[in-house]
């Protein structure tokens, strides 16, 4: 999940992103689920609610351009986006699950004509 695959990861223009948020019938193949190997095919809004889950990061530990936390998967973000900046949001997980529900959200930004633009959302979390 933390491993960026430019050849298969989803890339949307701003207009497409807005359109797909409104059209929940359009489904995308996001990859394979860890553990089961089942293919994940869901609409963008469901993907964002389930996998990005922004509300989990309300009390997150935040770092800028620094990997403070990581799971066992190879992190190639700096190889794919060598000149980009990123913000890492780390949710340590809950006591209820002994921290095994930890997750990391990395927002990657590029500068263009003096403004920063979101170019990638990289999600990492505990998996089996």
Predicted regions and their residues:
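C-terminal-biased regions
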Residues: 1-128
